[in-house]
Amino acid sequence: MKTPITESIASADSQGRFLTTTELQSVNGRYQRAAASLAAARALTNNAQSLITSAAQAVYSKFPYTTQMPGPAYASSAVGKAKCARDIGYYLRMVTYCLVVGGTGPMDEYLVAGLEEINRSFDLSPSWYVEALSYIKGNHGLKGQSATEANSYLDYAINVLS
């Protein structure tokens, strides 16, 4: 899994050299942000159910047809609503994984690779998840560096979906 630290090491190793001052500064920067990232991951995990439920409501409010259209891709039934919440939870979980490792590797490897195919196969609209993640970003309650760290991965996911 790629992280800023593993990328620096892989680059230096492939060239048979020690880490440069710039690479060491990059690694040090990651360690300085690690506490804030872990605090953000912990807070998002602890508040996950509430954030997911509220984010799903934000999707239903912005896209009311999602609760009116019959079919497996929509939230017109309890099963459909549960699937929507499950999918939002998956995105949020990926954000917490990225916070823990300090890079987009988990999202790139477990989510981005097959995202377009999954959405097309199941007739899912990326705009639903953009709305859900935007809601989470605006309502996670994090402050300072923890918010900055979480928002960077939420933004990454939003951009991938856009």
Curated annotation (Swiss-Prot):
InterPro entries: Globin-like_sf, Phycobilisome_asu/bsu, Phycobilisome_asu/bsu_sf, Phycocyanin_a
Keyword Ubl conjugation: no
GO biological process: photosynthesis
Protein location: Plastid, Chloroplast thylakoid membrane
Natural source organism: Rhodella violacea
Chief location category: plastid
Lipid biosynthesis keyword on record: no
Extent of the signal sequence: none
Name of the protein described by the UniProt record: C-phycocyanin alpha chain
SUPFAM superfamilies per record: Globin-like (SSF46458)
